């Protein structure tokens, strides 16, 4: 299957909000288009491996202007609607406006989709209609990484209006517009790329038309104040700079590491991106494991060489050379692993894979919940890009039709695949058994090293007593020094080995993995049994089981990532 940039790469999604009645006299129109195009150009230049996608409801004014600039640049756009298409077209004032809308719809990357909203199938009342516009504004705010606002900079109390949507972005979407309201969650906030624009109905503007600023929340102030700073998308002052960088790194890794790899045969972005994330996670997991093993071996050699150099046999000063070489090799491995973020990338991409997998099966059975609302929301800031990336993939899949039979099969396939991974095809040779075996193996080596150290220490005590009582047992007087130094040398070697095995065990986390994997094995076994034994209709049973399993899998994987973040690749401790 050939690559599709919007299915095989994480996109940067650009949203738009703005006035419908823009003053588009020729000089204003030109400067607004130039400013919007400059944002697109900067994103395309700074993130060359990352596709751009515009979300625009194609309302009159700002929505259409930005869509036209995107189309001229070859940037695809999709059209989320606040209500069914026929009802939405009624809001356009003239036949020319409706024709312009239809023309832009034809050029969209996919047909328009109506966002989920609490409305009946009938034409909504005026108050409900305003709420629908607020809902689509909230959808764009939550789905986009870059929000462009063509706004005059003046506040106005209008539900679903431009100023309202900007408030959503800077201070968080109100609870009534969230699919999963929670008083405990931090509000999801972000910057607004504000281009000052004039309105026909009100010529006042806060700044000159075309003036560009980035609007961000000012945490130092109380109330609903925000700062206006003059930066560009991706600059260090942009709160989403790390998000853009991580998305670009993922796409660059895909191009570099998986070049020529066939894509998964599906039209689902979450499924195809999950497969990509799994391959990249495995690649970096192998590199991180190799780095840790090399550090272990190099540190062991360095410790042994130093012990020999400082040991009982004289004139072995040349052993300082392999000691320094082994130590230097360990430092090189450490620097390369940390500069390349091998372990962090393995963890990030594995977390991304799990989240995308859960999102895919949720979507498949019609659970239009977003993993981004549940996943890593209260974890470290450096992980925030993962749920945002999953949210982008979820947005891409909103266009897909619902297929009940596929959804039921997808749930069973997911549960069976996860159970087989943890338990093994025969229930004996899965990840749980492998990690438990590794824990036992290295635990035994650690114990034997400690026991050897104890035996050598006891031998040293016996030697000291015997040498004090009857030194003639050891022959020539110089032999006493050799016996003493030799036993001290062996004690040191045993201590180094015990410390290395202990450090390696802690950093690989075999014992903790085995414990967690045992719990996951039980969960997936029970989930499959619940699916088989449920008296509910198949679709309802699948939804019920996968909703609960998905939440548990996300919580467990979030804990797994945090556990490994606390155990970075470091030079192993031998003392």
Language-model regions: role of each:
Residues 15-17, 56-62, 67-70, 108-109, ...:
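Small-side-chain structural scaffolding
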Residues 221-451, 458-575:
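Conserved non-transmembrane functional hotspots
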Residues 52, 149, 168, 193, ...:
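Hydrophobic transmembrane signal anchors and adjacent membrane-proximal interface regions, especially
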Residues 1-216:
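Acidic/glycine-enriched connector segments
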């Amino acid at each position: 299957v050939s690559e599709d940039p919007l299915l095989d790469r994480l996109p940067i999604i650009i949203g738009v909000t703005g006035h419908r009645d823009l003053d588009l006299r020729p000089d204003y129109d030109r400067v607004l288009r130039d400013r919007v195009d400059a944002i697109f150009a900067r994103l395309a230049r700074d993130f060359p491996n990352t596709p751009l996608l515009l979300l625009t409801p194609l309302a009159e004014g700002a929505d259409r202007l930005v869509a036209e600039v995107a189309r001229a640049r070859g940037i695809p756009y999709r059209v989320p609607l606040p209500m069914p298409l026929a009802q939405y077209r009624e809001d356009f004032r003239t036949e020319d406006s409706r024709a312009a809308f239809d023309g832009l719809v034809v050029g969209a990357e996919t047909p328009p989709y109506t966002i989920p909203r609490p409305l009946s199938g009938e034409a909504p009342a005026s108050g409900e209609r305003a709420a629908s516009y607020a809902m689509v504004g909230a959808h764009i705010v939550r789905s986009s990484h870059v929000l462009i606002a063509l706004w005059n900079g003046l506040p106005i109390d209008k539900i679903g209006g431009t100023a309202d949507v900007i408030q959503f972005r800077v201070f968080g979407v109100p609870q009534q517009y969230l699919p999963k309201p929670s008083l405990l969650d931090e509000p999801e906030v972000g910057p607004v790329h504000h281009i000052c624009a004039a309105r026909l109905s009100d010529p006042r503007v806060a700044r000159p038309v075309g003036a560009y600023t980035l609007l961000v929340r000012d945490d130092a102030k109380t109330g609903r104040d925000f700062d206006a700073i003059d930066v560009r998308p991706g600059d260090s002052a942009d709160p989403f700079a790390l998000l853009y960088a991580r998305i670009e790194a993922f796409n660059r890794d895909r191009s570099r590491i998986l070049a020529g790899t066939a894509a998964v045969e599906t039209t689902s972005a979450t499924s195809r991106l999950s497969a990509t994330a799994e391959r990249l996670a495995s690649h970096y997991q192998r590199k991180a494991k190799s780095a840790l093993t090399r550090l272990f071996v190099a540190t062991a050699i360095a410790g042994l060489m130093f012990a020999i150099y400082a040991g009982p046999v004289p004139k072995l000063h040349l052993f300082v050379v392999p000691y320094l070489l082994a130590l230097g090799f360990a430092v090189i491995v450490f620097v390369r692993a940390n500069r390349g973020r091998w372990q962090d990338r393995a963890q990030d991409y594995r977390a991304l894979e799990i989240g995308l997998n859960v999102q895919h099966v949720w979507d498949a059975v019609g659970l239009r919940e977003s993993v981004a609302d549940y996943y890593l929301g209260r974890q470290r800031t450096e992980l925030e890009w993962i749920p945002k990336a999953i949210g982008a993939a979820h947005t891409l899949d909103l266009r897909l039709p619902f297929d009940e039979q596929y959804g039921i099969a997808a749930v069973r396939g997911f549960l069976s695949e996860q159970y087989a991974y943890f338990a093994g095809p025969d229930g004996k040779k899965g990840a749980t058994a492998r990690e438990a075996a590794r824990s036992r193996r290295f635990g035994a080596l650690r114990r034997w090293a400690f026991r050897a150290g104890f035996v050598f220490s006891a031998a040293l005590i016996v030697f000291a007593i015997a040498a004090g009582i009857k030194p003639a047992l050891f022959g020539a007087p110089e032999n006493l020094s050799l016996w003493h130094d030799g036993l001290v040398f062996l004690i040191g070697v045993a201590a180094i080995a015990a410390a290395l095995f202990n450090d390696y065990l802690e950093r690989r986390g075999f014992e903790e993995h085995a414990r967690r994997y045992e719990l996951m094995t039980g969960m997936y076994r029970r989930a499959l049994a619940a699916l088989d034994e449920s008296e509910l209709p198949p679709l309802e049973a699948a939804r019920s089981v996968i909703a609960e399993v998905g939440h548990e899998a996300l919580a467990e994987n979030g804990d797994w990532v945090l556990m490994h973040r606390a155990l970075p690749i470091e030079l192993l401790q031998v003392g």
